Amino acid sequence: MWYVMQVRTGTEENIRCQCQRTIDRRILERCFIPYYQQKKRFQGQWHIQERILFPGYVFLIAENLEPLMENLKHVIGMTRIIGTEETIVPLTDQEVNLLIRMGGDKEQLVRLSQGIIQGDQVHIISGPLQGMEGAIRKIDRHKRIAVLSLDMFGRTVDMKVGLEIIEKNKDRNTEACLQET
C-alpha cells in the first residue's frame, strides 16, 4: 500500500533520508519524493531543473501499517499520515496509477511535456501530460509550467508540472498542425 506523510515544506529530503536510515526494509519497502522537470533560463542558457511535485509530502510504500506507524514515531519532523480523522487511508489504485503513469514506477520523475496551443485549446504532443489536457487548469508559458487540478489525498489538489509550449496558433485548425508533428 502507498501512504503519504505530511512534513514541513523544505524538510522532505531530510525526512526521506531519516526514514530510509531508521526503518527496517522489511517494514518500509520504499520511501520517495516525486519530482518534476521544469525548464529555466539563467546565465543566458536553458537548464532543466527538478522540483518537488508535492511540496510538504513524502510517499511511503509498506504492506503493514501498524509496524510502520510504530517506527514513524521515531522520525523527527513528521507531521502526520494522510487519512481521515479516525483512520489512515492509503492512496487509491487510481492515485497510484496516476503517479506511476506520470513519473514511472521507480524514478518518480515527471518529465517535461511539450504542447501546442490552437485557439483556446492546448494539445500535448509529447510527455506524460498526453491525454490529460482536461486536467490542465492553467498554463504559465513564461515559467514553462502547467497547473493541473487533480483529486489526490482525498481532496482536489493543484499540481505543477513542466510544460513547454512549442507553438501557439490563433486559428482553430488543429488538424493541420497536429498532422505535421
Model features per residue range: what roles?
Residues 1-121, 147-181:
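Acidic-enriched and Gly/Ser
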Residues 111-114, 135-140:
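Short linear motifs in intrinsically disordered
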Residues 127-129, 139-144:
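Short, conserved beta-turn/loop elements at beta-strand boundaries and strand-helix junctions
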